[in-house]
C-alpha cells in the first residue's frame, strides 16, 4: 500500500513500522522513556472490545438518526446523505451530544485510559471534558494536522490519545 498525505506520496525513507508497547511488561519509568524516545505509545487492548462496540454503535446510531449511515447502521457504512444541518441548526451542539454519550465517555474519561496516563505522568490524571470525535468513513481521512497547539498550550503535561472504534490497517 502506498502512503499518501493530501494526495502526495510519502518517501519510503520516512516510513517505518510502529513499535507496540505492552503495558504489562513496562514499569512507569519505561513507559515514560518509550514515549520520550519514540514520541508515541502504540497500545492495544487497553479498552475492552465490548465497550468499544457499544460506544461505536451509540455513535453510529446518532449518525443514522441524521441519515448518514445505511441500515444496518451498526456496519457504519456511509449513506452519502446527511440531514444533520436540516435537523440540527448548530453542528457544535450536535457533536457535543454525540460526544457525551455515556458509553463513549466510559472509554475517553474512564479508568482504563486514566490509569495509563497516570502511570506516564506519575501522578493522578484526568481526561478533557471536551473531546474531538472524528467520525470518518472508509476512504476518507482527517487532513494532516497537529493537535499540540490546540491542547497543550504551554504545558508538557497534556497528551492526546487516538482511539479507533473499528479494525484498521496500520
Regions found by a protein language model. Give the residues of each.
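Short, conserved beta-strand element in jelly-roll/cupin
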Residues: 152-170
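Non-heme Fe(II)-dependent double-stranded beta-helix
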Residues: 1-37, 44-144, 150-151
Amino acid at each position: 500500500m502506498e502512503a499518501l498525505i493530501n494526495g502526495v506520496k510519502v518517501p519510503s525513507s520516512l516510513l517505518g513500522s510502529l513499535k507496540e508497547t505492552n503495558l504489562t511488561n513496562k514499569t512507569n519509568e519505561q513507559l515514560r522513556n518509550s514515549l520520550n524516545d519514540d514520541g508515541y505509545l502504540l497500545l492495544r487492548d487497553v479498552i475492552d472490545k465490548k465497550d468499544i462496540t457499544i460506544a461505536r454503535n451509540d455513535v453510529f446510531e446518532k449518525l443514522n438518526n441524521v441519515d448518514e449511515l445505511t441500515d444496518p447502521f451498526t456496519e457504519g457504512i456511509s449513506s452519502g446523505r446527511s440531514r444533520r444541518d436540516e435537523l440540527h441548526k448548530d453542528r457544535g451542539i450536535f457533536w457535543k451530544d454525540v460526544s457525551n454519550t455515556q458509553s463513549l465517555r466510559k472509554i475517553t474519561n474512564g479508568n482504563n485510559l486514566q490509569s495509563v496516563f497516570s502511570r506516564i505522568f506519575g501522578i493522578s490524571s484526568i481526561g478533557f471534558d471536551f473531546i474531538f470525535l472524528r467520525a470518518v468513513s472508509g476512504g476518507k481521512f482527517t487532513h494532516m494536522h497537529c493537535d499540540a497547539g490546540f491542547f497543550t498550550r504551554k504545558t508538557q503535561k497534556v497528551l492526546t490519545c487516538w482511539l479507533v472504534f473499528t479494525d484498521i490497517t496500520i
